[in-house]
Amino acid sequence: MFEKKNRTCLTVYLHYNRDARKLSQYGDIVYHSKRLRYVLVYMDQELVEATILKLKKERFVKKVVPSYIKELDQNFVGNLWRDEEPSVVG
């Protein structure tokens, strides 16, 4: 029925807040910080590299930072989806 797509987030820093509307053509705007002038844009994983290059060429964009959450080690105590490791105690 529905297929889960890999999506990622880009943090786009702007010179002016009025330019945040222009980012809606690149993906889904999730959050806009008016005080710190950045926008979180979610998009499909396969479009990220091309979109970063396009956004860096735009005059209203200061900086583009991709999300690194996929690269972090999420195997820690308290994580519900971690791989079960054999217990040392018993």
Curated annotation (Swiss-Prot):
Cell compartment(s), UniProt: Cytoplasm
Keyword Cytoplasm carried by entry: yes
InterPro entries assigned: DUF2129 (IPR016979)
Keywords: Cytoplasm
Keyword Cytoplasm assigned: yes
One Pfam family matching this protein: DUF2129
Cellular component terms per the entry's GO annotation: cytoplasm
Family: Belongs to the UPF0298 family.
NCBIfam families hit by this protein: PRK02302.1
Protein name stated in the entry: UPF0298 protein SSU98_1559
Taxonomic lineage from the root: Bacteria, Bacillati, Bacillota, Bacilli, Lactobacillales
